[in-house]
């Protein structure tokens, strides 16, 4: 939806089986066909890991508080915070968000954006660069401090791809793939990734 992915559809109208407690909530709210904010971050990450940059960014924008300022009278939460959930299309208050400051959404969306959309994926030995972005992003830059080393990362997308790696250059040296071993990093680093 324009406010994020619905948890399930259609909503429960009655107990479908023992333990189907979603029916205790009004249709379109919370677990009964609402739009849970925290899971949106994992959806962003999942689409990015599949290389679907357009979809990952769309999911981010649908649930981003800052992107909903033009519908503040519907959303009814502060423009700088996530709610726990937004009422789904089965509700007569579709788009209204609830329970601000009681959610882990900011952290899951941050992981979805940093590791997914921007593609900065650290591990024990180094850093993998694997952005999944909208095709229209022809160039963007990232300033990152990674294990005490400064990285200036330029991402070039001349062929309007959503993901992939054509080349990765670290301090003028072309690397074998999209992975930067930590032992190659200097105090200050210039990184150019071409999709």
Task: Identify what each model region corresponds to.
Residues 61, 74, 81, 131-132:
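Residue-level signal for alpha-helical context at structural boundaries
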